[in-house]
């Protein structure tokens, strides 16, 4: 479970499946967008070998070379996405989920009809440019993790009940059931209607808002990849404080002009101080003063049924690992845990088989990084919650499970 080098490139290719015409190519290096492009001959070869397999009824999903992992994915027999990553320790699970998020982002911006019934390639290329900012965020070193976990990134506000009550009242006053409050792409509070949004739009909408340049207000047309892939909705955003945005998903009404300053002030001025207290909750998902063990460097908590997660890095006197390294280590550990120790729930056929041959499901696992690092990672699952911790080298190995269990019990009332 290595830590990739600073300049490890990732390339994403999007092609029309029938013709092989490239629609776009996006790249990143060291987590930042890059202008580096793959030669057309390489693009043609990667698409050609995939099409060759399809003609022989062979499904080519992934391949590995000495230093690169390649994953192919075809969507609706119309769009082919290919991702190449030279990052050390990159898993196929991460790349597969990235491709699903990328296609979801494309549907979110241009709609499914434009992607499955391509009439004009050049026009589609231009329309897809609006999705580049969102797509590039999947290639970089994001502070979010919903693209990998397929859970909504959340934070826990200090006065959550008051915010929830105000949000519900505001939603009723504006006549829309889908309202949320976001800080840096994470959900602070949301109405029941917003929480009922399907995947992937439940993850994509906050991620989209977090990837856009700051604006006081927006009226943004979006399609819902799961709920409404062919009919657009309106995503209205209003900035309450810098970095803190109110989002409404609605139809033709209300018009943006109806959300005037007087209406906003009436609902949100009484909560000004609690709103300000939410601003630091971007990088740290937990309210200030929440008791966590001093050895905890970072954590990921998932509610597997609600599809929500908390992803936070804790302040530490130690300079190493950096917050970016901690996020990367936890992301890599999650892919290991999800593919090896805590796989997704089995389907009906698998459950039937399990009744005959019951399998033992693990409750916890841990990993010690080395040599010379000593950082420890532990995962524990209790019921519908899964907790992953990154711990300092000072933590005794025999106490990892106990510490993780106590931490999970303390966090359970929050998520």
From Swiss-Prot:
The keyword Cytoplasm applies. Probable planar cell polarity effector involved in cilium biogenesis. May regulate protein and membrane transport to the cilium. Proposed to function as core component of the CPLANE (ciliogenesis and planar polarity effectors) complex involved in the recruitment of peripheral IFT-A proteins to basal bodies. May regulate the morphogenesis of hair follicles which depends on functional primary cilia. Binds phosphatidylinositol 3-phosphate with highest affinity, followed by phosphatidylinositol 4-phosphate and phosphatidylinositol 5-phosphate. It is found in: Cytoplasm; Cytoplasm, Cytoskeleton; Cytoplasm, Cytoskeleton, Cilium basal body. Disruption phenotype: Embryonically lethal. Embryos display severe developmental defects, including neural tube closure defects, abnormal patterning of the spinal cord and the limb buds. They display polydactyly on all limbs and defects in skeletal development and organogenesis, including malformed sternum, ribs and long bones, as well as severely hypoplastic lungs and conotruncal defects. The number of hair follicles is also reduced. Defects in ciliogenesis are clearly noticed and result in abnormal hedgehog/smoothened signaling. Component of the CPLANE (ciliogenesis and planar polarity effectors) complex, composed of INTU, FUZ and WDPCP. Interacts with CPLANE1. Interacts with CPLANE2. Belongs to the fuzzy family. GO terms for biological process: anterior/posterior pattern specification; aorta development; cardiac septum development; cilium assembly; coronary vasculature development; embryonic body morphogenesis; embryonic digit morphogenesis; embryonic neurocranium morphogenesis. The gene is Fuz. This is Protein fuzzy homolog.
